[in-house]
A protein has these predicted regions:
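Catalytic subdomain that performs nucleotidyl-dependent activation
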Residues: 86, 108-172
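ATP-dependent adenylation/nucleotidyltransferase module used to activate substrates
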Residues: 1-123
Length: 172
């Protein structure tokens, strides 16, 4: 599972850990805001300390992202479609990473999309964060995800994290 430091991944990773099955939690920064990365790493450490079935670490994807960026010769001041296409590349690079580690460890990739964002308005990247094997909170509204976060006693920093797609260099 990819851990972003947000409430959706916080809830899903905690629920996965509670199953007792092997869980691999990955933080995958790509030009990430420092507070997002630190929340994600703190949550992974929390899971590893509380659940013996959890392993986790950070996979820095900045270098492969920059290589793609330079290969495609993206112009930041040009076409909006080009910017969006490359923003979605972040999600696809993370998906590739999750499936790599999933396959070498014999694990499924678990999604963090909720009912409204992923399955209501389609706020996900095709073949990116939408490309998963299981989606435990796919039927939950965001309000229900927040209720679960409270019930699971997740840290305030995760419960209060500003939702972001993690695809841009700024919070949005």
């Amino acid at each position: 599972i990819g851990v972003s430091g947000g409430v959706d991944s916080g809830v899903v990773s905690t629920l996965c850990a509670m199953t007792g099955l092997k869980v691999l939690a990955l933080e995958m920064p790509i030009r990430q805001q420092k507070d997002q990365a630190s929340r994600a790493l703190e949550h992974i450490e929390f899971l590893k300390n509380k659940f013996p079935n959890v392993e986790g670490f950070s996979v820095d994807l900045n270098e492969p992202f920059e290589a793609l960026y330079n290969t495609f010769d993206v112009k930041d001041d040009e076409f909006p479609a080009e910017k969006l296409a490359f923003a979605n590349t972040r999600s696809r690079l993370r998906m590739l990473t999750l499936y790599y580690y999933g396959q070498i460890n014999g694990l499924l990739v678990c999604g963090t999309g909720n009912k409204v964002e992923d399955f209501g308005i389609g706020f996900y990247t095709k073949y990116g964060d939408g490309g998963v094997d299981v989606s435990p909170i796919a039927d939950l509204y965001k309000t229900e995800v927040y209720a679960l976060a409270r019930a699971l006693d997740l840290p305030e920093s995760i419960k209060n994290a500003i939702p972001t797609d993690g695809l841009w260099d700024v919070d949005r």
